Curated annotation (Swiss-Prot):
GO molecular function, one term: ubiquitin protein ligase activity
F-box domain mapped to chain residues: 25-72
The protein's role, per its UniProt record: Substrate-recognition component of the SCF (SKP1-CUL1-F-box protein)-type E3 ubiquitin ligase complex. Able to recognize and bind complex-type oligosaccharides.
Gene assigned in the entry: FBXO27
Every FBA domain range: 100-277
Residue ranges, annotated region (Disordered): 1-26
A GO CC term attached to the entry: SCF ubiquitin ligase complex
Protein's name in the database: F-box only protein 27
Length: 280
């Protein structure tokens, strides 16, 4: 018998596709400033301040200018957006050289405090009790914190304070005295699971001579020992701000209740002061 002959179809080799030319990246910096302004107005405020402002001098000038933020607010139909736009139009900031428009801070709800989570002890006036202040990792996640680190106290009262100059932060007297802003203060504090702790907070609104015009204090009950790494939040809103407020003094204390050498006291972090429009 003869061998079976197989008839296979010849495999088709696909023809090579023509090489496509690489697409050119879109360079937004080539846009006219008026058109680039419209494009940037669709970017979230925090991204504008944190990233876009760093791209180049041209972008920085647009982000620091008032026109971009007025364009953003004109499209914001929320109660906060409408109130902020009305405030911006009726209480315009004076011309400033090389100063970012403060509307960006309002839109992004950016705090005006410095070093809230323990990047060393910089920007704080400190008094060291016991073995003094140190910085450690958080034992419990603090929502919204820029970093998960905290300031830790010792077996005697440790004190830490910042005095914030509102005009240096870009706010001007007419705005501060308009009766249409409020100041929200916030602080997180907690304990180790194996040691109780105590905590105090004092926030004062000061005039140009640093005379106290208003204040808020919190002296919560101590956290007991064996507490599952408790973490608590303290907030207060100054909504009826008196004429003449120019500074905010933010001060807190902490210590442990076991009086152990080392750092077993109150753990404080994510301290913030936010100036925002008052919704009447």
């Amino acid at each position: 018998m003869g061998a079976w002959a197989s008839r296979g179809r010849a495999a088709r080799v696909p023809a090579p596709e023509p090489e496509s030319e690489p697409e050119e990246a879109l360079d937004l910096s080539q846009l006219p400033p008026e058109l680039l302004l419209v494009v940037l107005s669709h970017v979230p405020p925090r991204t504008l301040l944190g990233r876009c402002r760093q791209v180049c001098r041209g972008w920085r000038a647009l982000v620091d200018g008032q026109a971009l933020w007025l364009l953003i607010l004109a499209r914001d139909h929320s109660a906060t957006g409408r109130a902020l736009l009305h405030l911006a139009r009726s209480c315009q900031s004076p011309a400033r050289n090389a100063r970012p428009c403060p509307l960006g801070r309002f839109c992004a709800r950016r705090p005006i405090g410095r070093n809230p989570c323990g990047q060393g002890l910089r920007k704080w006036m400190v008094q060291h009790g016991g073995d003094g202040w140190v910085v450690e990792e958080n034992r419990t996640t603090v929502p919204g914190a820029p970093s998960q680190t905290c300031f830790v106290t010792s077996f005697s009262w440790c004190r830490k304070k910042q005095v914030l100059d509102l005009e240096e932060e870009g706010l001007w007297p007419e705005l501060l005295d308009s009766g249409r802003i409020e100041i929200c203060v916030s602080d997180w504090w907690g304990a180790r699971h194996d040691s109780g702790c105590m905590y105090r907070l004092l926030v004062q609104l000061l005039d140009a001579n640093q005379t106290v015009l208003d204040k808020f204090s919190a002296v919560p009950d101590p956290i007991p020992q064996w507490n599952n790494n408790a973490c608590l939040h303290v907030t207060h809103v100054f909504s009826n701000i008196k004429m003449g407020v120019r500074f905010v003094s933010f001060e807190h204390w902490g210590q442990d209740t076991q009086f152990w050498a080392g750092h077993y006291g109150a753990r404080v972090t994510n301290s913030s002061v936010i100036v925002r429009v008052h919704l009447s």
